[in-house]
Structures are given as C-alpha cells and as structure tokens.
UniProtKB/Swiss-Prot annotation:
Cofactor(s) it depends on: Fe(2+)
Protein name per UniProt: tRNA N6-adenosine threonylcarbamoyltransferase
NCBIfam families documented for this protein: gcp_kae1, T6A_TsaD_YgjD
Function: Required for the formation of a threonylcarbamoyl group on adenosine at position 37 (t(6)A37) in tRNAs that read codons beginning with adenine. Is involved in the transfer of the threonylcarbamoyl moiety of threonylcarbamoyl-AMP (TC-AMP) to the N6 group of A37, together with TsaE and TsaB. TsaD likely plays a direct catalytic role in this reaction.
HAMAP family: TsaD
Organism, as annotated: Syntrophomonas wolfei subsp. wolfei (strain DSM 2245B / Goettingen)
C-alpha cells in the first residue's frame, strides 16, 4: 500500500439532519468546516423527520459548500477530490449529498470518494491527535449505531461487537422523550443527570456479564420506562435521579466492554467516536478506567463528535492515497452493509 501524503479534499455530509461541507488538507488540517444544523426544526417533532430533513438539505447544500470554499479561501478547482457520506443514514438525506457530490466531481473532473459515516466518526480523531498508536480499540457510539472495533492500522478494522437492537444514542432519545426532557435526548439527559444521583434507582447493566462484545439497550430502555411508570403511580417519580441512573447504566456498559476488549486483544489504545462520545459522564468514566488500566485514550473535541464533513474528508484522505475512488453511478444506502 502506498499512501499519498498530500491531498486537499472537499467532504460532504448529509446522512441525517446536518448539512455539512469541509475542506481538509492531508487528512489532518481543517481549512473550513461548515455545519448547518436542523435541530431547531426537528425539536418540535421530538425527533428527526426524514422528509423534512431531505428538503432542508436540498435548500442548504449549495450554500454550505460555497461557504466551505469561501472560508478556506480556495477556488473550486483547487481540490484534489470530492468525498461524500453514502451510508448509512436516512436514504433521502444521503441522496442529496451524494447527488450533489457526483455532479460537483463531474463538473470539476475530480475523483469521487464514498465514505462510510461511521468510519468518518472514527477518523475525526486523526484531525486532532497525531500520536495515536495502533492497534487500537475503537468505541463508536451514535444515534443510530453502537459498535466496538479493533483497528490494526488506519486502513484496517474488524468489528468485535455491535448493538443487537437500540443504539446508545437512540436509547437516550427514547428515554428522554418519555421523561419529558425533549430532543435531542443525549444532552437533555446529561443535563438532568447533573441534578440527580445515580444509585437511587436500580437499572440493569445489560450484557455486562457476558464474555462477548455485543450490546443491547432496548432492555435498559424498557426497564427505565417500567420503573418510571411505577414511580409515577406512587407519586415518587424523580426525573433527575432517573436520568442519572439511566446514564450511569448505559455508560458503564460502554466503558467496561471497551476495557475488556483492550485486555483480550492486548491493546494499549482506546478511541471513542460518534455523537454519544460527547457525553461527559462517558468521557469521565472512560478516563478513569483507562488510567487505572494504563491505557491511552483518545476522543475528538465536542464539535467533531457530532456530524460534520471534516471527518468525511479526513477518512477520504486514506481512500485517496489508495486510489479507492467511486464511480459516478454511486448510490446511497440506508444500512451499514459492511463496516
């Protein structure tokens, strides 16, 4: 494998409700990173409405890309390639980014690069950390996915385990909804948890006693819902304690599974990625446990944990080095296909 060290790549991200474009040099230096969020629009619905998200992407994509070039002070022709998230995500939303990227690449006669959204989250770490040692365990936690991977090097990864039902971020959203905390659920539960105390209630640590690296958060969500309904009937419901206990139960499983994976595969590095990696309780407990185990820990800054296009361009740098280009017939896929 020959890795080209020099690249200037436009990244485009429209997998959910952020319209994003960024220009990154050599997979590490962010020249621009524009994100147009739709959170305010979808809050009134209690979650992302796919049709609305797609229409807003159509309205925003051209302007967001133009702003990325303007902020980077570059002409369109200066880039070496166009990269776009084409899986997984909301298919209508993905199609907006993919269609724009294909047309843009064709017009500029530049190569097109397809990026897996979850790979993008992982490579957000490379934008801010230069000393990541491999092999590494990577915990990817987002609204739609929860996976534990073994990365042998920046170009090779193996899935060790995934969620069998709800993703961590999805569980946060659903629990926040029935607690009346609003959307998005992760930040809402994190805020409520600061006013409560974990341990006042007892929620299960699902799959924690298993020797594999699978996850399941549907049972935790259901247990929280059942306890909440009982407490409400008794007039003993405390939303802050419930938020704290739910967050603690979910975070403990994520952290301990990661530590066990590092021990089994004799790895000295753990990376975290994805929107849920912004959770402060997760960061704090992972810091504590990796320090106790003598492991190195890496995670992106808060602005790079959530969906953005800089991470897409960062991942695309490695595809560019391998000359792994996509045809102009590239399609969008809602499912992961293969990680």
């Amino acid at each position: 494998m020959v890795l080209v060290q020099e690249s200037l790549i436009l990244g485009i991200e429209t997998s959910c409700d952020e319209t994003a474009a960024a220009i990154v040099r050599n997979g590490k230096e962010i020249l621009s990173n524009i994100v147009n969020s739709q959170i305010d629009i979808h809050q009134q619905f209690g979650g992302v409405v796919p049709e609305v998200a797609s229409r807003k992407h159509i309205e925003n994509i051209a302007g967001v890309v133009h702003r990325a070039f303007s902020e980077a002070q570059l002409a369109y022709s200066a880039i070496d390639a166009v990269a776009v998230t084409n899986r997984p995500g909301l298919v209508g939303a993905l199609l907006v980014g993919v269609s724009f990227a294909k047309a843009f690449a064709y017009a500029l006669e530049k190569p097109l690069i397809a990026v897996n959204h979850l790979h993008g989250h992982i490579y957000a770490n490379f934008l801010e950390h230069r000393d990541i040692e491999f092999p590494a365990i990577c915990l990817v936690v987002s609204g739609g996915h929860t996976s534990l991977l073994l990365m042998s090097n920046p170009n090779k990864m193996e899935v060790l385990g995934e969620t069998r039902d709800d993703a961590a971020g999805e569980a946060f959203d659903k629990v926040a909804r029935f607690l009346g905390l609003g959307y998005p659920g992760g930040p809402a539960i994190q805020e409520a948890a600061t006013k409560g105390k974990a341990g006042q209630l007892q929620l299960p640590r699902v799959f924690l006693d298993r020797n594999d690296f699978e996850f399941s958060f549907s049972g935790l969500k259901t247990a929280a819902m059942n306890q909440w309904n009982k407490l409400q009937r008794r007039g003993q419901a405390n939303v802050f304690d419930m938020a704290a206990e739910f967050q603690a139960a979910l975070v403990e499983v994520l952290v301990e599974k990661s530590i066990k994976a590092a021990a089994k595969y004799q790895v000295r590095t753990i990376m975290m990625a994805g929107g849920v990696a912004a959770n402060q309780e997760l960061r704090n407990l992972m810091k504590k446990r990796t320090k106790e185990a003598g492991l190195k820990l890496f995670y992106p800054s808060l602005k790079l944990c959530t969906d953005n296009a800089a991470m897409v361009a960062a991942n695309a740098h490695y595809h560019y080095g391998n000359r792994s280009f996509a045809p102009l017939s590239l399609n969008a896929y809602p499912s992961l296909l293969s990680l």
